[in-house]
Amino acid sequence: ESVSHDIGKTRIFTNLSLCVNKNEKVLILGRSGLGKTSLFRLLLGFEQAGSGKILVNGLNLDKAHVHQIRQQLFYLSQDIDLRDETLNNLVTEIWEFNFDRKLSRETIEQLLTFLELSPGILEKRTGDLSGGERQRIGLLIGFLLNRPIWLLDEPTSALDNAMKKKIAEHLLSLDKTMIIISHDHCWQDSSAVRIERWS
């Protein structure tokens, strides 16, 4: 609410107000340099606003609540950064970390099938993945973590058109709150999203 933000001497935005309701899907459109990614960094507590108030599920985004808020968020960055390890190790860590529900190996295999990834990809190291594979593994991590709020920065940019449409339709059907930054028409053409145009 009424958030202003600077990086160095550069003003990113002034008096920004944005309300996203539970399970709502909001698509932010606008050219580069308008602060769309900075909005995500503010919500994650990686950057601090110069003025204004940020609330996430009723919690004020401050040092006292930032860890609690991050536990509610899943962030898929445009350039997803994965530790250099095998995907099997990465998935196992997430599996063991997720205390909210039981994750079976069958569930993971079903997700891989949906993402059109073979089970053998789990033997690959993260550094050996193509751009499209990295993006789909990022989405796999999101499904496994099962957080209530998703921040998606160009989540389908490296995928072909058929996969873009498949992923967008599925994500928009989930009972999740989502803020999406994307130039892909699969998001813009959906009636399930509220479009915010920044200029």
Predicted regions and their residues:
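Conserved ABC transporter NBD signature motif
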Residues: 52-60, 69
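Helix-to-loop junction immediately C-terminal to a conserved catalytic motif
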Residues: 44
